[in-house]
Each structure stands twice: as C-alpha cells, then as structure tokens.
Amino acid sequence: MYQGKGTYLENYLDSISTLPSELGRNFALIRELDYRTSDLVEKIEKLKSNLLVTTNGTRRAVHELTDERASKHIKLEMKQVIEYSDEKVELSNQTYELIDKHIRKLDIDLKKFETELESAEEEKKKKKSKQSQNNSTVESSTTSSSSSSSSSSLSLSSSTNNTSSLNSSSGGGGGGSGGGGGGGGHSSHSTGNKKGKARDSLTSSSSSGNINGMSSSSSSSSSSSSLSSRKQKSMAAQDIASITGNNGDADVRVFNANPNDLDLAIDPNEPTYCFCNRVSFGEMVGCENPDCKIEWFHFECVGLTSTPKGKWYCPDCTRIKVKK
C-alpha cells in the first residue's frame, strides 16, 4: 500500500529520536576512559623514572625490594590501561553499530518508498489510459450516432425531393400520352380512364410510401428509420414515364427500378399489379380493355420482351373477346 513520503519521514524521525542521547552517552564514556588512561600513563612514566636511575651512563638498582614493588605496581597500572582501551573499543563498536542500524533502516525505507512510488505511478498511468480509452469509445459512439442521424436526415430529405419530382413527372407523362394517342388515332375514353386510374394509384402509392416513411422515421428507432429511408429512396427512384407510340403502339409504362429494391419490405398501402400481385417495377404494359380487372402487367409475367405494336389485351381479356 502506498504510504506517502510524509509517513516514511515521520516513522524514521521517530526511530532516530533517541539516537542523539545514545551517541552522547557513548562519547562521554569514551572521553572519560581517555582521561583515566592518560592519568595512568603519566603515573606509569613516573614509576618507571624512579625505578631506573642512570649514573654516568650506567644503570643500577636502588633497592631490590623497592624495585620489585615498583615493578608490580607498574604492571597493574598497565593492565588497567589495557582494560580502559578495550572498553573504549567496545563503546566505539557499539556507536558504529547503532549508527549503521539506522542507516540500513533508512536505505530499506527509501527502497520501499521508491518501489511503492513506481507502483503508484504505473497504476495511475493504467487508470489514465483506461479513462482515455473510455473517452475515445464515448466520442466514437457519439460521432457514429451523429453521422447516422445526419445520414438518415439526408436520406429523408432526398426521398422527399424525389417523391415530389415523381408526382410532377407522373402528371406530365400522363398528359403527353394522351396527346400522342390522339395524334395516332388510337385514343379512346376507356384508355384515358385506365391511364388516369393508373396514375392516381401510382401517385397515391408514392405519397403513401413517403408519409409512412416520414412517420416511421419520427416514431421508431434509428434502425427502423434507416430501413424506412431506404424504402423511400427505392420508391422515389422509380422513374415513371408514360410512353405512347405515335404509330398506335400499346400503352407501356417503364419503371427504372433496381431489382434488389424488391427485396425490401413492401409498404402495405402500395398498390399491386399483374397476375403476380406485386408492386410496379421494370417495364409494364396496360390492357386496352376498360373493364380489365388488373389493367397493368409486368413484361415478364405476360411473356413480352419488347413493346407490342397496336392495341394489346391481357390473356384474360383476349379469351373474353374471342368468346364474344
């Protein structure tokens, strides 16, 4: 556990609080022993001077008994000097060990503090790195959500614009088809009603899809909003053009839709056509029978590969005409 430099400093100061007094006591004892040793050495020197008398360069003993006593006295004093010296050495060793003990403790505490400091710094770096990663994840999620929202808004705006163009294009194409039919001599009341109904149903389909798309975009989650936007783009991308040949060709309606768009969810309000009961896509041909129940058919469902010449009737209406 990280204790902090303040804690280590307090503990160390507490441990050395008695050190000055201990050192002072030892030094005082050593000084006292020095004084005693000095006195003994001086005393021994005097005894030695009295023991040896030099006359004319020769040495002679004064009295045997006195010399023997003086010699024993000198030995005792020398022995005492040695004892004092041993005590001083012992006190010096104690003082050294006392100081060395505190130095070792200081080294151990410094090493421990350094290790704990490195661990604390490493843990702080890990926390900072983890916090940075979390912030990056949140920012990335926010950016992704913002991009998704912007993309959805752009898709909705594009779908609305395309749907408006679709409605105006459907109205203009219907008028052109009526004019072309009159010039070719094949325009009739039934055909006009039929085209008008088809235009109304297609326009209603586009408008319904647009309204449903905007409603689901505002009320559902971001995933359903994305699906609705894609469906709106698919429906709005169907470029509808009424083509009526000046030479009396059958009424053909072309839907430039991507076949992949058919895999998307179909709006239940969008009208269906043909025997297959599917929505409008690709090229479609209209039956000239005003009473036809289906009216519009996909080329592939009625076996057509190109625009038929003249008037065209669906298989059901053809059988009815043959019977009549």
From Swiss-Prot:
Function: Involved in regulation of the growth and differentiation transition (GDT) process, probably by regulating gene expression via histone modification.
UniProt feature, compositional bias: Gly residues: 170-186
Binding site for Zn(2+) 2: 287, 292, 314, 317
Record remark on domains: The PHD-type zinc finger mediates the binding to H3K4me3.
Domain of life according to the entry: Eukaryota
SUPFAM superfamilies per record: FYVE/PHD zinc finger
Biased composition, class Low complexity, residue ranges: 140-169, 201-229
Main location as per UniProt: nucleus
Biological processes annotated in GO: aggregation involved in sorocarp development; epigenetic regulation of gene expression
Null allele phenotype: Cells provided with nutrients proliferate slower than normal. Upon starvation, the progression of differentiation is delayed in a cell density-dependent manner. Cells form tiny aggregates and more aggregation centers compared to wild-type cells, resulting in a higher number of tiny migrating slugs. Cells form complete tiny fruiting bodies 3-4 hours faster than wild-type. In a similar manner to wild-type, most cells remain as non-aggregated single cells in the presence of caffeine, which is an inhibitor of adenylate cyclase activation.
Feature type site, description Histone H3K4me3 binding: 273, 284, 288, 296
Full protein name: Inhibitor of growth protein 1 homolog
Region (Disordered): 120-237
GO MF term set: zinc ion binding
GO-annotated cellular components: nucleus; protein-containing complex
Binding residues for Zn(2+) 1: 274, 276, 298, 301
PROSITE patterns assigned: ZF_PHD_1 (PS01359), ZF_PHD_2 (PS50016)
Gene3D superfamilies per the UniProt record, alphabetical: 6.10.140.1740, Zinc/RING finger domain, C3HC4 (zinc finger) (3.30.40.10)
